[in-house]
Amino acid sequence: MRVLAIPGSLRATSSNAALLSAAGSVAPAGTEITLYDGLGGLPHFSPDLDVEPIPAPVAALRAQIGAVDALAISSPEYAHGMPGSLKNALDWLVSALEPIGKPVLLVSASPSGARHAHAQLLEVLRTMSMQVIDGGAHVFSRAKLDASGGITAPELLAALATGFAQLAEACAPG
């Protein structure tokens, strides 16, 4: 299974990027995970720009999504919602064919638990006709990271392993 992992934060030391990076150690054998790092390079969405030729960063994101079997998105919560940069990326994908029907594991990690952002993301992804596997919203603080940014909380690793197993099942033929 090939997965594009999208951290919803632009922060250099993002806990959500750390969560997705840890997925490689708990995902089913044979899983290839690519961490998307272009969120900050996407132009602000405008329907006027969503015509051929579309902006290169948008074309690259759509191509990356088209080349994988599934997505994994992890988002923090800012002011009771998903970050604007993540919503911007999703807005660029609304008119694209690549995400339709694609399985997506959604997890949200934030010191507050990210419940509001998680609910927003569920609504948006379902509206986009994506096959959402709800990995849940988790209370996640920097205290659960080691010095190299690895996750030290066994309960988070277990939840991530379960989510990726469900994602693999959703990608299985038949």
Where are these regions (language model features)?
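N-terminal beta1-alpha1 ligand-phosphate binding loop
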Residues: 1-31
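A general structural signal for well-ordered alpha-helical segments in protein cores
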Residues: 3, 16-20, 42, 58, ...
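Short hydrophobic segments within beta-strands
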Residues: 6-8, 36, 107
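Short, glycine/serine-rich, charged loops/turns that create anion-binding
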Residues: 10-11, 40, 97, 111
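Short beta-strand elements in bilobed, periplasmic/extracellular small-molecule ligand-binding domains
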Residues: 31-40, 44, 132-140
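N-terminal beta-loop-helix "entrance" segment that forms/cooperates
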Residues: 38-55, 145-148
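Helix-loop-strand module that forms the ligand-binding subsite of alpha/beta enzymes
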Residues: 53-131
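Glycine-rich phosphate/pyrophosphate-binding loop and the adjoining helix
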Residues: 131-174
